[in-house]
Amino acid sequence: MSWRGRSTYRPRPRRYVEPPEMIGPMRPEQFSDEVEPATPEEGEPATQRQDPAAAQEGEDEGASAGQGPKPEADSQEQGHPQTGCECEDGPDGQEMDPPNPEEVKTPEEGEKQSQC
């Protein structure tokens, strides 16, 4: 009893978009602001030309002064209670390889191991 329903796949019609018309040859003068930064005039202060390292130091000082102990770390640990069967990554944060089946000892009938 094999019933084949009608396929719902329908190819979309292709749309052809015409490329924009060329007004004229592009000259480097048209995009010179992107290549060279604009030089400030004599009457304007050069606020954008500050040393980036000095600006970075100012941001770091403000960020470190307002921070106290991080409460997020404590709340994350309390949010996940340990059930006694926690499979964790290795000490480097990488997954551990599965044990070699030849080295694994099978539990005796009286002993049971918890499996994750």
Swiss-Prot record:
Biased composition (Basic and acidic residues): 102-116
Region annotated Disordered, chain positions: 1-116
Pfam family, one: GAGE
Superkingdom of the source species: Eukaryota
Comp. bias (Acidic residues): 31-44, 86-95
Tissue: Not expressed in normal tissues, except in testis, but expressed by a large proportion of tumors of various histological origins.
Family: Belongs to the GAGE family.
More about this protein: This gene belongs to a family of genes organized in clustered repeats. They have a high degree of predicted sequence identity, but differ by scattered single nucleotide substitution. Their sequences contain either the antigenic peptide YYWPRPRRY or YRPRPRRY which is recognized by cytotoxic T-cells.
UniProt name for this protein: G antigen 2D
